[in-house]
Regions:
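Short, well-formed alpha-helical segments that are part of the catalytic scaffolds
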Residues: 14-28
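Short beta-strand/loop segment that forms part of the nucleotide-sugar
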Residues: 33-43, 63-65
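Conserved donor NDP-sugar-binding/catalytic core segment of glycosyltransferases
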Residues: 98-132
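A short, conserved alpha-helix in the catalytic core of glycosyltransferases
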Residues: 170, 176-195, 199-227
Length: 273
């Protein structure tokens, strides 16, 4: 069978949401074949058993990892099983409420060969647009966003720009980077940059691949003409007080420092195009 795209969902203790996600995804009306890879990093038998219910569907592969291999490595470990022109990375909580979403995303990529990464509008459970667009990060702003520093006059406008609060989320537009909660990545780009960067464990690999897209003369585009639903909960959410309680937030800081060190002398590659 010839596949147009491969969908990858990486799960960590959200198996019921993955089932709901896949059931809505399999109802998408498309004129091409796609395959699905579900990766479980939970190391939890109950979670794995729930995911295995999806084996009754064709073109779905379930991969249960014996240890949490991290976000980028888990995706790269299935590189030999990816087929088609596109890779769709999807978070477990995504829901496909309209049946033409997937087709619209792929058609737009087909018709715009200079796009390397495309992400749809996301609507959370309360009906608000999720802010999935960001500027290439600066550590001092990432810290400021989570503390009182965000309200200081000298930083307030910079934080707003970092969070892209000024953007019109109803407009198709080029952006620095997109959160990888739901993105289409051109397979040619994926192969060129060797997938997601394993310098990071949990965060920043989505920033990195968008950086590399621009470096390799591919555009990163926010596509507002179709939308998916998300639960609106971000694993990296939380203020400074949560830092000492949350291993996830501490990992976010570690990965952010790695990114900043790696790109310390680099200019914004988007400005080249």
């Amino acid at each position: 069978m010839n596949f147009k795209a491969t969908i990858i969902i990486l799960d960590f203790l959200k198996a019921p949401q993955v089932l709901e996600n896949m059931e809505s995804l399999l109802e998408q009306k498309v004129d091409f074949n796609f395959k699905n890879i579900i990766i479980d990093n939970s190391c939890n038998k109950k979670n794995a058993d729930i995911l295995k219910q999806l084996e009754k569907y064709k073109n779905i592969k379930i991969k249960i990892n014996k240890k949490n291999s991290g976000y980028p490595k888990a995706h790269n470990d299935v590189k030999n099983e990816i087929d088609g022109d596109y890779i769709l990375i999807v978070n477990p909580d995504i829901l496909w409420k309209k049946k033409n979403i997937f087709a619209k995303l792929i058609n737009y990529m087909d018709n715009n060969q200079d796009i390397g990464i495309l992400g749809p509008k996301q609507i959370n459970r309360s009906g608000k647009v999720e802010m999935t667009i960001r500027a290439f990060p600066k550590i001092y702003l990432q810290v400021a966003r989570r503390t009182f520093l965000r309200y200081l006059p000298i930083l307030k406008s910079k934080v707003k720009y970092d969070e892209m609060q000024h953007l019109d989320y109803n407009k198709i537009q080029d952006v620095d980077w997109l959160q990888s909660s739901c993105v289409v990545i051109r397979k040619k780009l994926w192969d060129k940059v060797n997938g997601l960067c394993e310098d990071y464990f949990l965060f920043m690999s989505d920033v990195e691949i968008c950086f590399q897209a621009w470096e390799n003369n591919y555009r990163v585009v926010y596509f507002s003409k179709t939308e998916v639903c998300a639960d609106g909960k971000r694993s990296s959410a939380g203020g400074f007080n949560q830092f000492f309680k949350s291993g996830v937030l501490r990992q976010h800081l570690k990965d952010s420092i790695k990114y900043r060190v790696k790109h310390f002398f680099d200019k914004n590659p988007r400005k080249k195009i």
